[in-house]
Amino acid sequence: MELHNDEKRLLKAFQDSNKKIMNLEELSEYIEKEKVMRAAFWLSGRDFLEIIENKTRVCELTELGKNSLDSEIPERKVANYIKENNLESIPIKDLSKILEKDETGAALGNLKKKELVTIDKGNIVFKNLDYKDNEEEVLKKVSEDFNLSNYSEDEVKIIENLKKRGFLKINEVVDRSFELKSAGIDFIKNPIEIKEEITQLTREMIVSGKWNDYTIRPYDAKIPTEEIYPVKAHPMSKIIQEVNEVLISMGFKEVKSQIVQTEFWNFDTLFEPQDHPARDMQDTFFVKYPNTGIVPKDLLEKVKGIHECGTIGSEKISKGWCYKFDEKVSERTVLRTHTTVSSIKYLASLSETERENPQKVFCIDRVFRNETIDYKHLPEFYQCEGIVMAEDVNFDNLVGVLKEFLRKLGFEKVRIRPAYFPFTEPSLEAEVYMEGKGWLELLGAGVFRPEVLEPFGIKKPVLAWGIGLSRLAMLRLGLTDIRELHKNDIEWLKKTAVSEK
């Protein structure tokens, strides 16, 4: 192992002194004091020696403390003034004649606190002019002995009070010693050669051949250095960006929709009955203003027929939900509970010509649920969903798309389980395998039911899926509490890797 010359000089100091433990002053006889700590830090990183720190609290007199030591503390000045002038008392207002302006309040307060005086009709009356003051004694002692460890518990309390009064300050002094470890002991058993080092070659050295007289200092890429945290995006933003790039690379197009939606677009078009529990106030945020929105009448009639009896005009699609559909409910506004509404609105906007062409779209955006906040639920979170519409796509194609999508996100092991959603049939849940955690549910998917597509005149099959990005972020970042994502803990943000695939 090649050592720096300063490291060698430090080890040679141990070798020459025949000691295993040395302090800073002893080592500075062999190597400049400012280089000792740097060399010791390097050697401790190589496990050659251990840096031992001994912290001591010490007192230091302030200018006020020094002045009080040379003359008197304010309380004593007042007592001596009364004594020297043969007075029985002194009016409080006359304190300004004896003390500085900033001393009068503190002096009077301390005289009363120490129970040395009484106040009689605005006059200060001393009980004993020759009183003994512990603060004066401790202040004198501090001028001779700075080490707090040499003081009793009562004296330390007095010192703390003197600090509050500005007579002294308390500092922490760190004494360092350096002890050789086994690697260092083995190293100094052999002669230590110190050859002058250079960090760069000059033309003159090469031409004259003097470069042979020097050691060229090698670069050590493993030497401990200060950690630097560059500016970077929030981990959640990085995951959103990554998912966006993955889907675009798979040929998808991004679409958007508004946060506030009518129940028609958020629920009715997805064949979710109006009495479904998910539409209750405990699960959905209803908008107070505007509390209603505009619903396209032609689509409303078609969706209403599907819900009530499964028909559009005279065409029978299914049995429907067999209940009385309320158009007023469809007009109510909510904060969207999913981003699937973006895909539905996109499908509804397609012209007859566009419906003939394959479509692949996705949406990444915020959704809102009236959830109780806990370690795995938030009322606002990011969701990603997508659809594929084409002539011959089927359930197998859906599984293939999902596996490819998850593989690009870094999940090699994926398994599919059957599931139920009101607007897809068949439906599935995809689980991914993570070392140490096992199989974890990550997304839901399925094939849109005819009841969802027929009102828009779409005859081709449409594959649909959705994934909560907060859930993905928790898996990626090893979090057990979803709230940690949004606490903005600066230490966690600095130390979280830019990519966690």
From Swiss-Prot:
Signal peptide: none
GO biological process, one term: phenylalanyl-tRNA aminoacylation
MF annotations from Gene Ontology: ATP binding; magnesium ion binding; phenylalanine-tRNA ligase activity; tRNA binding
Keyword Magnesium: yes
Catalytic activity from the UniProt record: tRNA(Phe) + L-phenylalanine + ATP = L-phenylalanyl-tRNA(Phe) + AMP + diphosphate + H(+)
Sorted UniProt keywords: Aminoacyl-tRNA synthetase, ATP-binding, Cytoplasm, Ligase, Magnesium, Metal-binding, Nucleotide-binding, Protein biosynthesis
Subunit-structure text: Tetramer of two alpha and two beta subunits.
Family that this chain belongs to: Belongs to the class-II aminoacyl-tRNA synthetase family. Phe-tRNA synthetase alpha subunit type 2 subfamily.
The protein, known as: Phenylalanine--tRNA ligase alpha subunit
The species this protein was found in: Methanococcus maripaludis (strain C7 / ATCC BAA-1331)
